[in-house]
């Protein structure tokens, strides 16, 4: 299994979830709290989504690099979400 086929779904879901949460009115205003929410959300989705998929389907064939792929997909999703956070921050400063 390649990293692209494994990590696309969790990265996509974490980026979409971060975009939806960042638009809500209950989203924290301080940058530190935003980063904490970003990291926790991304970690939760990128690790638990593949694990629940494995357990729900019933194929317990967790391959050798499963946790490495989870960690790498988490880092990729955090990087994409930080870029989104930076763009939104720059956009809010202009207004």
UniProtKB/Swiss-Prot annotation:
Keyword Transmembrane helix listed? yes
Of which family is this protein a member?
Belongs to the MceB microcin immunity protein family.
Q: Its membrane topology, per UniProt?
A: Multi-pass membrane protein
Q: What does this protein do?
A: Protect the producing cell against microcin E492.
Q: What are the protein's UniProt keywords?
A: Bacteriocin immunity, Cell inner membrane, Cell membrane, Membrane, Transmembrane, Transmembrane helix
Q: What is this protein called?
A: Microcin E492 immunity protein
Cell compartments where the protein resides: Cell inner membrane
- TM segment ranges: 1-21, 35-55, 67-87
One BP term from GO: bacteriocin immunity
- GO cellular component entries: plasma membrane
Kindly indicate whether the keyword Transmembrane helix belongs to this entry: yes
Q: Which gene encodes it?
A: mceB
